[in-house]
A protein has these predicted regions:
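Non-globular targeting/processing and membrane-anchoring segments
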Residues: 1-33, 37-51, 55-114
Length: 114
């Protein structure tokens, strides 16, 4: 399993995303290295099809494909992990979203609840 975290230096939240990713991989006993990929220019963003920071891809698949919009140096938002009547957004993916993506990549179905 290949795990990438793409980020833009203008994003102060990418290390929080990395920490959540590490926690999920550790909790699920995966010893998978995380490839950190800095996106430093609009040209890099185009080349990497970078939809914003932070972006986590597992085996080249974005963990939140519904959130992929315009390509460029910008910040992304993700649905929070809590169950609400309406959508609330966070600047980093929640552990539940990350875990479900990891489990799909491992062939474990739709993911388990925390």
């Amino acid at each position: 399993m290949r795990v990438e975290l793409l980020y833009w230096d203008g994003d102060s939240n990418y290390m929080t995303a990395r920490q959540r990713l590490v926690e999920v991989l550790t909790e699920d006993a995966f010893e998978t290295p995380i490839q950190m990929i800095a996106v430093n220019s609009e040209a890099d963003a185009e080349l990497l099809a970078f939809p914003g920071s932070p972006t986590i891809r597992i085996d080249d698949v974005d963990i939140h494909p519904a959130g992929v919009g315009e390509i460029g140096l910008r910040l992304r938002s993700y649905p929070d992990d809590a169950d609400h009547a309406g959508p609330l957004l966070e600047p980093v993916p929640g552990k539940r979203l990350i875990r479900r993506a990891v489990e799909r990549a491992r062939g474990w179905g739709h993911g388990r609840e925390p």
